Regions:
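Active-site/ligand-binding-proximal alpha/beta "capping" segment
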Residues: 83-132, 136-138, 381, 387-390
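C-terminal binding/interaction regions
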Residues: 321-343, 465-508
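Glycine-rich nucleotide/cofactor/substrate-binding loop typically near the N-terminus or early
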Residues: 39-109
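Active-site loops and adjacent core secondary-structure elements that bind or stabilize anionic groups
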Residues: 152-160, 164-335, 339-370, 392-401, ...
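N-terminal glycine-/serine-/threonine-rich phosphate-binding loop
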Residues: 1-57
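Cysteine/selenocysteine-centered motifs that mediate thiol-based redox chemistry or coordinate metal-sulfur cofactors
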Residues: 302-303, 309-318, 443-484
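Glycine- and Gly-Pro-enriched alpha-helical subdomains that act as flexible
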Residues: 274-294, 418-464
Length: 508
């Protein structure tokens, strides 16, 4: 088996030419014969570097509007022939096929064309045939051939050739092949998912190019990696790298804050809101949100849907927190936060988020649509003798937005666009209710005149009875229990309003 191989012949055919010139010049200096196609051939000629057209090698012109350029035995024979196999070498000599030691190729911008909203005919024309075939052939024969399928590898190969007198090692070629198969598999997955958008086949195929190694996973003894493009979603203005737990909380925070249009601040801990308020100014929203549970807010993730000015930053700066997220910041606010180097300050970018959720379990993956609907006053049906007031309806809507994003079983209390307290992640609904009452009392909230939202129906009337005795005047629940009538009758007996939405919002 061969080890070090000196590059004598190279085939170069790329869609994007940026970054290519230094490597091409080095290959020419080292006496490598270059073969190329179309625009790449002209690019090399413009550098005053000798290059042979692939058409001259094959004896065939580019045909079918450029669909067929490199698909020819004289090209693929030169790539796939095994240098150590006598029969291959005999055939190469018989048909006068030059051995190609290096293939530099990229792929048509299929994903970019889809994202740009191109027509189906434009998208189809960006399905690369020759390029993907060259990648697979060269990567398959890594024992004898170098494959570069990404401009990110140009400088790496250049350094190797300069240091090794124009040669590459087997280990280096195998590493390039691994990257090339990643490129080809990602490309094919993107094409499949485009075709699978309508009447999808029941298969799971996803590919993400970007990855970020995390400090650790959920706990220090666990390893963690984030697959995705964080830089597209956020601009980090300050702080250390995000941890696994930070990312989980940031995801929950973004999902929650996007429910609100008015100036709103939310504080989260372990994905659950411990403070939410909507007020005329973001400063007031911060102060009111913090008052919900200033104890749990310590070390939390904070998110706002308005610019953070210096006055608001000054108040936030009094609290120890892990992450702050906002659409923008006044420069003076950023400078204030940078006084503590580890605090993460993120500025949100305009990015469309996925509408799907995935979770690994057992030996597989489950997928579902994200819970993206929310029921407002128009979708609330009064089922009691007493109808909710306009303010109660407004607060019920506010509470419904929060309960949707809180771990089940959950109960949420709200008054005047402020979260008063919540019971979170309990194994029974009545326990969630009791927890919420205890928390409200701990922070001196009077529940009289407040409203309650439940993420699922009441199996028994006890929750309604306890809530009414605590001062709740209106209740929201999805309904759907075979004992709905018992809870409705209890609400009527206690003289409070109840609405149903018909939509459950479990969150696990």
């Amino acid at each position: 088996m061969s080890q070090s191989i000196k590059i004598k012949n190279a085939l170069i055919s790329v869609y994007y030419k940026d970054g290519l010139e230094p490597l091409v010049r080095l290959l020419a200096q080292q006496g490598v014969q270059l073969f190329s196609t179309g625009g790449t051939e002209q690019f090399i000629k413009d550098l005053n570097i000798p290059v042979t057209a692939v058409e001259d090698l094959t004896g065939y012109p580019s045909i079918l509007g450029g669909r067929v350029k490199t698909l020819h035995p004289k090209v693929f024979g030169g790539i796939l022939n095994r240098r150590a196999l006598g029969s291959d070498q005999e055939q190469i000599a018989q048909y006068e096929i030059p051995e190609i030691d290096l293939v530099i190729v990229d792929l048509y911008p299929f994903e970019e064309t889809v994202k740009a909203g191109g027509s189906e005919s434009d998208i189809i024309e960006k399905i690369d045939i020759g390029g993907i075939s060259l990648i697979r052939a060269a990567a398959k024969n890594f024992n004898d051939v170098v494959i570069l399928a990404s401009k990110d590898d140009y400088s790496t190969l250049q350094q190797q050739l300069e240091a090794q007198n124009g040669e590459t090692t087997l280990a280096q070629r195998k590493a390039f092949a691994k990257k090339a198969f990643h490129t080809s598999s990602h490309y094919d997955t993107a094409i499949f998912n485009y075709f699978n958008a309508e009447e999808p086949l029941n298969v799971f195929k996803h590919s993400i190019n970007q990855a970020q190694t995390l400090r650790y996973g959920e706990n220090p003894h666990q390893q963690g990696v984030f697959y995705g493009d964080l830089e597209a979603m956020f601009t980090k203005l300050n702080g250390k790298e995000l941890s696994y737990n930070n990312l989980v909380d940031v995801d929950a925070a973004v999902a929650l804050i996007d429910e609100f249009e008015e100036p709103t601040f939310a504080i989260l801990k372990h994905t659950n809101a411990c403070g939410v308020a909507s007020k005329p100014s973001i400063l007031e929203a911060w102060n009111v949100a913090l008052a919900c549970d200033p104890v749990s807010a310590f070390g939390g993730v904070l998110i706002a849907n308005r610019e953070i000015d210096l006055a608001t930053a000054t108040e936030i700066n009094k609290l120890f927190f892990e992450v702050l997220i906002a659409p923008s910041y006044q420069p003076e606010a950023v400078e204030l936060f940078r006084a503590k180097k580890n605090r993460v300050i993120l500025q949100r970018n305009e990015v469309e988020l996925s509408k799907k959720q995935f979770k690994t379990l057992l030996n597989g993956v489950i997928e579902q649509d994200k819970d993206l609907i929310i029921e407002g006053p128009e979708q609330m049906t009064a089922v009691t003798e007493k109808a909710p007031t306009s303010q109660e309806l407004k607060d019920l809507y506010f509470a419904n937005k929060i309960v949707k994003h809180t771990k089940s079983n959950t109960i949420v209390f709200v008054k005047n666009d402020q979260l008063l307290s919540s019971g979170v992640g309990q194994t029974s609904r009545v326990d969630a209710l009791k927890q919420a009452i205890v928390k409200a009392d701990a922070f001196n909230f009077d529940l009289k005149g407040s409203v309650m939202a439940s993420d699922a129906f009441f199996p028994f009337p006890d929750c309604v009875e306890i809530a009414a005795e605590a001062g709740i005047t209106a209740v929201l629940q999805p309904g759907g229990s075979i004992k709905d009538a018992d809870s409705i009758n209890m609400a009527n007996e206690k003289g409070i309003a109840m609405v149903t939405t018909g939509v459950r919002h479990f969150k696990h």
